[in-house]
Every structure is written in structure tokens, then in C-alpha cells.
Amino acid sequence: MENNDTPVFKKVESIIFSVLSPKTVKKMASAKIVTPELYDKEGYPVDGGLMDARLGVIDPGLKCKTCGAKLKECPGHFGYISLARPVMHIKFISVIYDLLRSTCRECGRILIPKKEIEKCMDELKNVEIECGPEERRLKIKEIIRTLKTINKCPYCKSRQQKITLEKPTTFLENEKRISPIEIRTRLEKITDDDCKVFGLDPNSVRPEWMVLTIMAIPPVTMRPSITLESGERS
């Protein structure tokens, strides 16, 4: 049998890494996980459980409830869990720490005047053109070090408090713990324009997305269950 498809060659110019928003996680998911139960008494996946058949199947005799395909044809589908309370994403703790110390605790603005912001953006642009993205990242770190020393907001004039981090994920403001709920609320106040000063593209990542309210659940095919000695699946 002849294959008449002509191969297409394209060059990848760039890759953009982003953080999934809660809205995106929900949109790409096929099921909401609401119960810790995995299988019913007959051994079939429980709807709304981590082995929900809408996330794909690992048993040869079953069909996926999302695409209708069997094990070999179904790639699997994501689900999601709505968290009862926001949770800090461990991989972004250092970024969150910098953002909290560099923005106003009241209005959320970056702690430098508007004219200085424009100057910073011009400098970052020139550094990237002349020296590359790595030098741009170093310049951003330099800007953040300067912001940490400012104790009064140039916009709302509120006094800033000292913020410290008790590893791995506990933030303190004047020795008082800041909850993930409050941290997320503060990060929501940061404007898209201010995000760019920190090297964040607001179209790909918003600061508040680093504090999880929705957790993506991988397809069943990525995490097959095992059978215990008792005959139960886990």
C-alpha cells in the first residue's frame, strides 16, 4: 500500500513554558474527582474516583467513557480535584517569596514609581538584545534585590512589613504566619504590567496560579494500579 502523504518539515523557533491556570486545568479535564474510592464491589472503577473510566482504562475488557476506545487506542485523559483550601506549589516558593517582598501588601503594586518601571523595562529589553536571556534573568534578580529594601509603597503610601520564609512553605510577616489564602489574594493584586518586570508573561503565568486551588490528575494510563496479596487493587 502506497503512502502518498508528503512529509512536512518545519523548524521550531521557540518553546514557551507556562503554568496551567485553574480554568485551563478544568477545561482539559474529563472528570472531577470527588471520592477516595477506587473500585466498587464488582471490581469496576468508581465514577468520580481516581480510577474513573473517564480518565482512561487499564483493563483490556473495558472502554474509556470519554473517547470510547479500549486500552491500546485510548491515550488517557486528565481529571482534576478542587482543593478545600489553597496549597502552595513547592516548586514556586522562591518566586512567591520574591513577589511578596517586592510588591505592596495593600495595593499589590511593585514598589517602584511608574517612571522607574518604564526605565527597568527598557533596560531589560536592551540587555536581552545585547547579551541574551541569561543576562536578562540576572538583571531581574538585581532589580528584585533593590525592591526588597523599600519599606513604603510609592502608590498607596502604606508601610511594608518584613516578610520571612520558614522552609519549606511557611511565610511570616513580622513573625505572624500568612495563610495561603491571604498569599493568593495578594498575588491576585499584582498587575499584568508589573508581572513583566519580574520576567513573567501574564499570558502564560499569573502569580496567583502558583498557589493551587485546582490540582490536575494524570490519566489512569500514567499511573496503573497494582494488585495486593489480598486480591484488592491499590
Predicted regions and their residues:
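Conserved core architecture of multi-subunit DNA-directed RNA polymerases
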Residues: 1-234
